[in-house]
Each structure stands twice: as structure tokens, then as C-alpha cells.
């Protein structure tokens, strides 16, 4: 019986690891599906695809292993040069001030980007910019079930999409409090 406690701890730990792997696999599947949908949408409009949030992020290991988190698109925008290093059409700019004319892009794919903005106000400003420059927006962000999403110190918002509605929730605010503040409809 002295090892029973250790078996319980091991079982719980293994359960958490399996759960987080399944969450990660779900996020990866969602990201790849949305990227492919964004690419197909841009092609159907005969316009370029904008990637907001570089495929390499701020992880140098992705460059070394040549493992981008997603495709490059036609134009890639990020505030961090490392995230877009090597892209032939890389633009260093903020998602809240995109330096392109209205509806330049058929679609924009924003991956693991908006949750880094400090407030819902800035996230709405970014969403307005994305809507201004592209005909369709495809957003990917960490799942609420992702432990790393909760622990990441630079994640200030929860972001999710339901069809053509994008939701923002400032971390630390009650879900009862002004739900309207967190919801933005877009076409």
C-alpha cells in the first residue's frame, strides 16, 4: 500500500499530459484547417493572403529546425523581425496600423496574435484594421483548455471566433460584466 499514493499521482499526471496533448492536437488541426480555408478564400478572390503574426513567432528554434507554425501566405506582417525573417514579402508593422489600402487582401490569417494585445480596445482596433484590409478574417488563438495558454505571461486576452463573430475577453474580467464589450461582428 505505500506506493498507492504514487500511483494516484502518476495516474493524474498521465491524464493531464494526455489531455494537453489532445488539446494541442486540436489546436494544430484547427490552425491548419483555417490556414487552408484562408488560402482558398484568397485564391477564390484572386487576391493575396495576408499572414498577421509570423509563422516563426519569437521562437528561434523554429527557424533552426525549419518548422514554421503555419504557412507563409503572400505577405507576412509582424512587429518582430524574427517572426517573419526570410519571407520575401515581410512587413514589420503593428496589426493595429496595417500599411495597406482597403481590401488589398482576399483573406487574412491571424495566428496566435490578438491575445498578445493588452486590451479589448486594442484588439477591436486590430480587428477593424484586419476587416479594412481583407475581405475575410480567419483567427487562431490558444484554447481555453490549454494550460500553456493560461500560463503564458504575454497573453492578455481570450480570443475566439464563432462564424463571422469574433469574441474578446480581457483576462481577469467577469463573464457577466458587459458581454457586449467582448463581442465584435464582422462580415
Protein language model regions, located:
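Generic structural motif recognizing short loop/turn segments at the entrances and edges of beta-strands
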Residues: 35-39, 45-49, 73, 87-88, ...
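Alpha-helical membrane-targeting segments
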Residues: 25, 29, 68, 147-152
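Metal-centered catalytic cores of metalloenzymes
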Residues: 45-59, 176-187
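A broadly tuned "polar low-complexity/structure-edge" signature
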Residues: 31-41, 54, 60-67, 140, ...
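S-adenosyl-L-methionine-dependent methyltransferase catalytic module, highlighting the catalytic core
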Residues: 120-187
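Conserved SAM-binding loop
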Residues: 47-146
Amino acid at each position: 500500500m505505500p506506493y498507492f499514493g504514487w500511483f494516484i499521482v502518476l495516474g493524474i499526471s498521465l491524464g493531464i499530459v494526455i489531455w494537453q496533448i489532445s488539446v494541442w492536437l486540436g489546436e494544430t488541426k484547427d490552425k491548419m484547417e483555417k490556414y487552408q480555408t484562408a488560402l482558398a478564400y484568397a485564391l477564390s478572390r484572386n487576391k493575396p493572403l495576408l499572414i498577421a503574426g509570423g509563422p516563426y513567432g519569437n521562437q528561434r528554434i523554429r527557424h533552426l529546425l525549419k518548422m514554421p507554425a503555419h504557412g507563409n501566405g503572400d505577405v507576412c506582417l509582424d512587429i518582430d523581425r524574427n517572426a517573419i525573417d526570410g519571407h520575401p514579402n515581410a512587413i514589420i508593422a503593428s496589426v493595429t496600423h496595417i500599411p495597406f489600402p482597403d481590401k488589398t487582401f482576399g483573406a487574412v490569417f491571424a495566428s496566435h496574435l490578438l491575445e498578445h494585445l493588452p486590451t479589448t480596445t486594442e484588439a477591436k482596433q486590430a480587428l477593424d484594421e484586419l476587416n479594412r484590409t481583407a475581405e475575410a478574417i480567419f483567427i487562431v488563438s490558444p484554447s481555453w483548455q490549454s494550460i500553456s495558454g493560461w500560463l503564458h505571461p504575454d497573453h492578455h486576452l481570450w480570443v475566439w471566433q464563432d462564424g463571422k463573430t469574433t469574441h474578446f475577453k480581457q483576462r481577469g474580467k467577469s463573464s457577466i460584466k458587459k458581454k457586449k464589450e467582448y463581442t465584435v461582428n464582422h462580415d
